Amino acid sequence: MFLFSLTVLSALVLITESIPSVATDFPFFEITKKFDDIETYNNDYGILKFQEQEPMENLTCASCEAPSERECTLNQTAVVCDQDPNIACLTFEAFNNFTMTTTFRRGCFLSGILCENACRSFNASQDGNLTSCVQDCCNSSLCNAGSLPTEVTTEASTTAQETTATSTTTKQSTGASTTAEPSTTAAPSTTTKQTTVASTTATTTKPTTAPQTRATTLPTTAPTTAPAPIACGGVLRGRGTFTSPGFPGNYPNNVRCEWRVFLPRRQAIVFRIVSLDLADPGDSLEFFDSGRVIRTFRGLSRRKRSPSHRQTTNEKVLGEGEDGYYDDQEYVDYYYYDGRRKREPYFYQRRKKRRQQDRIVIQGRNQVAGAIFQSDAAGNAAGFSTQFVQGAADSESEASASSESSDED
């Protein structure tokens, strides 16, 4: 028994020694080790990195430049960019604060690392006058191409189909008349008379009636609904005059007009109100500086004389002969009436002027200033007329601007 167990133990030892080692002899570990060596070799020489950043060949981008996105889309063309890994398709829109214009552009752009270099380079070419700029870069062919809405095109196509349909029906009807007549008169042996009669009737009667009535009814119904737009507002430059719509006639209801001007440093603009006649408190003329309203004129909400008020014969003005302490250039007269609006004032007061009511001076600080006119639906009047002069800031304009108070009486 002892000898049998000894032989079995020796046999097991021989079997275990003959089994190959998993850590060294199995071929799978040799294969993975070879792949690890290849990966480290590629990383050392940058082969994998070069394959990931390989540029796209023949990148095609949409190219156009216009004041609006719609005009740019209408005029866009496809261009092939240079083969460069840093070139991308660009779309950007910028607003120039000095010229008050918008530029919309598409095309190839050498972006480098950041796409925002487009706004920086364009702002440098515009002397730093851009107030807003939006850019977008992409790296697939025609990824920056724009498209227009299909509503206008479908209407045009449907009208074209209707006109073509009417023309085809008239031609078919004339062809039927020419073929029907020879079939009925095919019994006689003479064929020359039949051909002459068919040609005369087909050319004289059919084409003159159907196309004319169809063409006159379709185009006359559509273009009668669009109202004429009211043109007002704009960009102010140099010197000139701007007025309310329809001046010296009454301005329309529910209208808003805005005039803007860009004021660089060491420049100023002077507004002088020549005439002012507003109907009610819902109608106003505002002057703003950098989005902040600095002066507002409204319709008569208080029984006080406005800058456009004309003196009547019943109003009394104190002169230097009656009161030596008053000066007409430094004081203004106020007349108060009762609820029935009698012409005779029941209360009269003379107060010293705080500022010139018809003159507004704004100093330049590289900002946007201007005026806004608004009217409601309660009524209308003659409106206003304002003169403006833009130029270099002097001591007189600075002194007049500093003497003006911020609130209106």
Swiss-Prot record:
SMART domains (UniProt xref): CUB
Record key words, sorted: Disulfide bond, Secreted, Signal
Organism of provenance: Acropora millepora
Cellular component terms (Gene Ontology): extracellular space
Name of the molecule in the record: CUB domain-containing protein
SUPFAM superfamilies linked: Spermadhesin, CUB domain
Cysteine pairings via disulfide bonds: 232-257
Tissues expressing this chain: Component of the acid-insoluble and acid-soluble organic matrix of the aragonitic skeleton (at protein level).
Superkingdom, natural source: Eukaryota
InterPro entries listed in its UniProt record: CUB_dom (IPR000859), Sperma_CUB_dom_sf (IPR035914)
Subcellular location: Secreted
MF terms (GO), sorted A to Z: serine-type endopeptidase activity
Pfam family, one: CUB
Lineage: Eukaryota, Metazoa, Cnidaria, Anthozoa, Hexacorallia
Biased composition (Low complexity): 154-229, 392-409
Disordered: annotated span: 154-230, 389-409
Residues of the CUB domain: 232-338
Signal peptide location: 1-18
